[in-house]
Amino acid sequence: MGFITVGHENSTSIDLYYEDHGSGDPVVLLAGWPLDSRSWEPQLHALLEAGHRVIAYDRRGFGKSSRPAQGYGFDTLATDLGKVLTELDLRDATLVGFSLGTGEAARYVGLHGTERLKACVFIESLAPSFVKSDENPNGVDEAGVADVQRAILHDRFAWLTELLGNFLNLDEYLGKRVSEETVRAAWNAGAAASPIATWACVRGWLDDFSDDLKRVDVSTLILHGTSDRILSIDGQGRRLHAALPHARYVEIEGGPHVMCVTHAAEVNRELLAFLREPARAVATA
């Protein structure tokens, strides 16, 4: 456990908290918004038992990392990721992104290439684009982003409760695939995040990662749940597979947005199988 300094704001440094466990080829876990690295608990033990070195860090504004008032665009977040890889001198790394973390992974490749990477994993992907269009009617537009940001400013804690209901499909899975205690832990993590960071990251939903994906030339796995109410499988997972047709693509039946929790066994099985025998992926032009 430690901190990596990625910048400064006025008189204080911007430090990212990270944990580094195990040995072997590194697996870097990129959490979803508005959660932090603790959300990977269902995957951590499985990865370590399989013999991987696992690095999980809290992006700026979340978890135990610094909470600056700026720097929440994907270019900055991807640059932070690059500094983590460089500071720890990680090579042959596999980036495992969930939700917002997939945007960081894609933008990192777009900015820095794949020299340090062995593979990429996109779970419930924000890429290729979450912008509403004829091709993606379930996406968001400027008005949708503004609505979410207003809800966060009005009552962030009530908004978070509603968000987690849709993250985990609680009307279907509470008491079956997810406990009240797990929901409470996720709520506490989201509530503890910087309100500025929580609000600011929403703007990133309007980013287009199509050009970034063109630089993906390493082994790639795409995992998407068929019941994701946030990033629909038609609008996101299947479109990402169209952009990366040589990726290993797996749909998890009934998986909600945070299927790493509700369908942990299925996610872990596919993730570990991919890490054992990765399938090469090359983006389409």
Task: Please report, for each region that a protein language model flagged, where it lies by residue.
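Conserved alpha/beta-hydrolase "nucleophile elbow" surrounding the catalytic nucleophile
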Residues: A31-W33, A93, G97-T102
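Conserved HGGG/HGGXW glycine-rich cap/lid loop of the alpha/beta-hydrolase fold
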Residues: E9-Q70, V84, I230
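Conserved alpha/beta-hydrolase catalytic His-Asp/Glu region
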Residues: V131-G139, A151-K214
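Residue in the alpha/beta-hydrolase core beta-strand immediately N-terminal to the catalytic nucleophile
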Residues: D58, T94, A119-V121
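Catalytic active-site module of serine/aspartate enzymes centered on a nucleophile-bearing elbow/loop
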Residues: P245-A285
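Conserved loop-alpha-helix segment in the C-terminal half of the alpha/beta-hydrolase fold
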Residues: R215-G255, E266
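Flexible "cap/lid" loop of the alpha/beta hydrolase fold
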Residues: A106-H154
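Conserved acidic catalytic loop of the alpha/beta-hydrolase fold
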Residues: T76-A93
